[in-house]
C-alpha cells in the first residue's frame, strides 16, 4: 500500500519549542515574498517558446544532475535514465528513478522533489515502484495543460526575476524573444542573462581556439590579438548588458588571480593561443583574466561572481561518453587568502565594485572567507553552494560566517539550478533554515525579534535584489 506524502509545516524548524515558535512567526512573514533568482542555469528557450514540457522524466529527471549522479553512484546507467539517449523509454527511465527513490532519503533532493510532487502536482502518496506509473501519468498529463507551461509556472511560483547563464558565444536569441514578449505585453516575466566567459577565458576548455574564432566573428574584433581579445570581451559584455545582464560568472579550477603588466599579458596570450602552452600558462592566464574581468566590472557595473574549486569532469569515461555537467564534478581544497590577493590588492578597496565569492571548501568559511569579506569593500560572500546547498550546509554557512562577516556581507540566496520546478522548494528551504537560525539568536537574546524579522526579509529577498542590482 502506498505510503502517504506529507510536508510538515514545521519542517526544518528547530526542535526546541520556544525557538520553533519564533521561527514560525519569522517564516510566516517571509514565506510569500517574491522569488529573486539571481544566478542559475534554467534554459531560456523554455520561456521564449513557452512550449509544453514533454513528460515527467524530461522535466524532473534529465536536467537534474543532483538526481542522476546519485542513481549513477548505485550502478544505474545514464543511458537507461535517458541522459543523452533519445532511444530510452521515458516511462522506463522514470520507473528506474521511482524504484530507487529510497536512495534520496535525508538528502536535499528528496526534500525538493517531495515539495514539487505535493505542491505543484498535488500528490498525497510517496513516489515508489508501486506509484511510478501513477506519478508518470499524472505529471505527463498535467504538462499538456496550459497552466503547466513554462511561463505559467514562472508566474505561479512568484518569480520576480530569474537569471540564466550564457557564454559570450551565445547569440541570446531566446532572450531577444522574451524581451519582445515583454515589450508587446504578451508576457511580463523578467528573464535576464549573465555573462560566463569560461569557453574563451580558459585555455584548457575544449575547443578553445575554435571558440576564439567564433568570438572574433560575433564581436567583430580580432580575438587572436590580446588587444582585440579584450575589446571583444567589452563588446560582448555590453551586448549582454543590453539584454538585461547585471552579472558575470567565472567557474575556474582555483581562485588564483594575477595582475600582469601589459607586456607580460601579451606574451602569455601568445603562448595560450599558440602551440606551446603549458598547464602553468593556462592557470596563469585564467588568474590574470579574473583580475581583468574585475576591472571591466568596475567600468561597466556588472556584478562579478567567482565559483572556484571544482575538479570538473573527474570521471574521464563519463566525460568522453556523456560530456560535461553529468554529476562528475568534485569539490577541492581551495586557497583564497593568497590566491585572491593580486585581484584584491588592485580592486578590493573599490566600493563601487561587487565581487561575489563562492566556495566548495567549507574549511575556508571562518578561516579565510569571512575575514576577507569582513574587510574588503568589494567582496561579498555567495550562499552555501552546490554540495552545501542543503539544510546542514546552510546552517554551517551561517554559523561560521556571521560572527566575522555579519549578514550584510552576504548576498541572500540563489538557487543555481537547471531544475526549474525545484526553484520555489529551494528558496523555501533557505527561508526556513534562516528563520530557524535567527530564532536561535533571538532565544539566546543575541537579537531582538524585530531585528530578526528585518533580517529574515533581507536574507529572503532584499539582499539578493540589491547585491545583484536587480
UniProtKB/Swiss-Prot annotation:
One of its GO terms (biological process) is D-galacturonate catabolic process. GO terms for molecular function: glucuronate isomerase activity. InterPro entries: Metal_Hydrolase, Uronate_isomerase. Its EC number is 5.3.1.12. It catalyses: D-glucuronate = D-fructuronate; aldehydo-D-galacturonate = keto-D-tagaturonate. The keyword Isomerase applies. This is Uronate isomerase. The gene is uxaC.
Amino acid at each position: 500500500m502506498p505510503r502517504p506524502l506529507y510536508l510538515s509545516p514545521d519542517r526544518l524548524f528547530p526542535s526546541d519549542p520556544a525557538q520553533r515558535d519564533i521561527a514560525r512567526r519569522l517564516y510566516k512573514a517571509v514565506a510569500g515574498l517574491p522569488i529573486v533568482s539571481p544566478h542559475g542555469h534554467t534554459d531560456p528557450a523554455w520561456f521564449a517558446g513557452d512550449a509544453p514540457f514533454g513528460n515527467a522524466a524530461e522535466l524532473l529527471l534529465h536536467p537534474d544532475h543532483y538526481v542522476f549522479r546519485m542513481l549513477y553512484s548505485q550502478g544505474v546507467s545514464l543511458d537507461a535514465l535517458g541522459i543523452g539517449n533519445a532511444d530510452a523509454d521515458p516511462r522506463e527511465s522514470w520507473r528506474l528513478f521511482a524504484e530507487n527513490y529510497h536512495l534520496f532519503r535525508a538528502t536535499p533532493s528528496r526534500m525538493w522533489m517531495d515539495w514539487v510532487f505535493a505542491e505543484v502536482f498535488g500528490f498525497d502518496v510517496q513516489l515508489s515502484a508501486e506509484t511510478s506509473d501513477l506519478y508518470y501519468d499524472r505529471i505527463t498529463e498535467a504538462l499538456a495543460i496550459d497552466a503547466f507551461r513554462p511561463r505559467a509556472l514562472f508566474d505561479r511560483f512568484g518569480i520576480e526575476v530569474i537569471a540564466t547563464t550564457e557564454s559570450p558565444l551565445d547569440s541570446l536569441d531566446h532572450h531577444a524573444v522574451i524581451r519582445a514578449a515583454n515589450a508587446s505585453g504578451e508576457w511580463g516575466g523578467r528573464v535576464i542573462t549573465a555573462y560566463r566567459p569560461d569557453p574563451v577565458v580558459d585555455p584548457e576548455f575544449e575547443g578553445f581556439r575554435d571558440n576564439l574564432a567564433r568570438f572574433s566573428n560575433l564581436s567583430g574584433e580580432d580575438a587572436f590579438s590580446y588587444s582585440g581579445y579584450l575589446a571583444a570581451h567589452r563588446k560582448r559584455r555590453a551586448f549582454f548588458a543590453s539584454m538585461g545582464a547585471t552579472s558575470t560568472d567565472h567557474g575556474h579550477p582555483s581562485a588564483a588571480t594575477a595582475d600582469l603588466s601589459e607586456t607580460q599579458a601579451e606574451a602569455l596570450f601568445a603562448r595560450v593561443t599558440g602551440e606551446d602552452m603549458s598547464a602553468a600558462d593556462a592557470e596563469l592566464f585564467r588568474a590574470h583574466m579574473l583580475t581583468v574581468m574585475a576591472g571591466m566590472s568596475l567600468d561597466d557595473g556588472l556584478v562579478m561572481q567567482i565559483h572556484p574549486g571544482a575538479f570538473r569532469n573527474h570521471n574521464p569515461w563519463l566525460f568522453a561518453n556523456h560530456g560535461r555537467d553529468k554529476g562528475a564534478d568534485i569539490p577541492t581544497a581551495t586557497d583564497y587568502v593568497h590566491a585572491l590577493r593580486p585581484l584584491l590588492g588592485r580592486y578590493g578597496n573599490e566600493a563601487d565594485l561587487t565581487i561575489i565569492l563562492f566556495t566548495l571548501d567549507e574549511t575556508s568559511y571562518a578561516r579565510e572567507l569571512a575575514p576577507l569579506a569582513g574587510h574588503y569593500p568589494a567582496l561579498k560572500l555567495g550562499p552555501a553552494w552546490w554540495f552545501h546547498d542543503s539544510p546542514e550546509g546552510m546552517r554551517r554557512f551561517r554559523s561560521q560566517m556571521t560572527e566575522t562577516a555579519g549578514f550584510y556581507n552576504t548576498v541572500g540566496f540563489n538557487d543555481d539550478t537547471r531544475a526549474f520546478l525545484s526553484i520555489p522548494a529551494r528558496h523555501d528551504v533557505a527561508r526556513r533554515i534562516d528563520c530557524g537560525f535567527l530564532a536561535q539568536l533571538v532565544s539566546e537574546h543575541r537579537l531582538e525579534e524585530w531585528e530578526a524579522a528585518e533580517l529574515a526579509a533581507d536574507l529572503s529577498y532584499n539582499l539578493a535584489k540589491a547585491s545583484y542590482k536587480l
